Amino acid sequence: MNNFSKRVLSIAIPITIQNIISSGLNLVDNIMIGNLGPLPIASVGLVNQFMFILTLTTFGCASGSGIFVAQYWGVKDFDNIEKTIEHILKVTYTLSILFFIVLFFFPEQMLGVFSKDPEVISIGIPYARIVSFTTLLTSFSFIIAMALRTVEKAKIPMYVSLVALGFNTVGNYLLIFGIGPFPKLGVTGAAIATLLSRLAEFLIYVFLVTSKKYPIRLSLKRMFTFDIVFFKKLMKYASPVIVNEFLWSLGMTTYTFVFARMSTTAVVVRNISSTIENFGFIFFGGISSATVVIVGSELGRKKYDLAKKYARKFLQLTIIAASIAGLGVILFSRVIINLYNVDEFIRNTVLTVIIIVGAAQPIKMLNGVNIVGILRSGGETKFAMFLEIVSLWFIGVPLVAITGLVFKLPITVVYVCTIVEEIFKIILGMKRYRSGKWIKNLINE
């Protein structure tokens, strides 16, 4: 096995294992809530959709800073790696506080944006208030996990995630259904379990970054210092990624808004379909993270030919992995949907939707690895932002809104419209990749 393969596997396998278990446990959690009926599914799904905006925005912070972490990792500059993390955490926590305020103080208004069903809103309010506290925990955990993966310590976040996910699943089982001495709390129990699992994850990461045994060590004192020159350089490339992920997540939330306004049934279909579809993306996280680390570190070392060679290999690997994943999602979707307590119409609609999204997996994953893993690694963050925002907001969102709300077409037709933007992205994205404009060193600018 050559050095490239060893590096890919050392990064991709732990992340893939983490994603497999995460998707599996999230499915179990979803099924537990699903056994309470379609209204709790809709309520939890809508709150989680708002949390999704924060998650993707935090991913934007992590991904934007990861461009520099990867290139600094190439030359083993740990001081600047830690400096990058400490500065991006300031941005992340500012955003987290804003999301906390909305979820805790204005849950009814937030849910009312998506749904007019009073029962859905009523069920979702206590869930939103409890999970609001996780915003202050997960942002830190997310940044540290991403940084550890970027310095090729992917096993650490895998183990931490397994502890947190296991904690969450057991907590859900005990508190949703009231097992043994625990009270039966339903959706509120799910929220408490989520909060406790995120707290456990946060505390583990705090221990890791304050311990001398691990490669990334953060200082509380340095967290309150600010290097304006360094920050400007970081945000020059990171800010387009943050804006990109925020607007992309807002676009995905707009899709959910359209489905919710179509009917409660439509939002239940979207929630279940998304949970199943996530199984298809179990390889994506590993491949895209490995792409960022390996291509980015070679750019940091100014090994441009090697970076280009590795980028091409990652695209080839993505096509193979995505084809297998898409087929697997289609084949096993019937087994998964049978675990849900839903009627025949929802069941059949979800199965049709899964065929659509499964067939689209190769093109979606290819776009993801190219944009997130390759173009951003070389600082092409403004182009990536333009490509994603234009394709989503000028193609995807208008199509979904018109077909779903104006013409009131079937759910499956509206779902097809969510895929159309990917065609536009792959044409322009691959053209940019072939131009080689992404091949540049950022840390020595």
Residue ranges of predicted features:
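Small-residue-rich hydrophobic transmembrane alpha-helices
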Residues: I41-F105, T138-P157, T256, V267-S333, ...
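Structural signal for membrane-spanning alpha-helices in multi-pass inner-membrane proteins
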Residues: L103, M146, N172, I176, ...
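Residue-level hotspots within pore-lining transmembrane alpha-helices
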Residues: I17, I21, L25, L54, ...
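Short runs within selected transmembrane alpha-helices of multi-pass transporters and secretion channels
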Residues: A62, V131-T150, P157-N168, A190-Y205, ...
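Helix-terminus/linker motif at the lipid-water interface of multi-pass membrane proteins
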Residues: I20, G24-A42, L111-P118, L174-L185, ...
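Transmembrane helical elements of multi-pass membrane transporters/channels
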Residues: S10-D29, I130, A164, S197-E201, ...
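Short alpha-helical transmembrane segments in multi-pass integral membrane proteins
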Residues: M1-I15, V69-L136, F182-S239, V295-A360, ...
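N-terminal transmembrane alpha-helices
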Residues: N3-I31, N35-L36, F52-G64, F68, ...
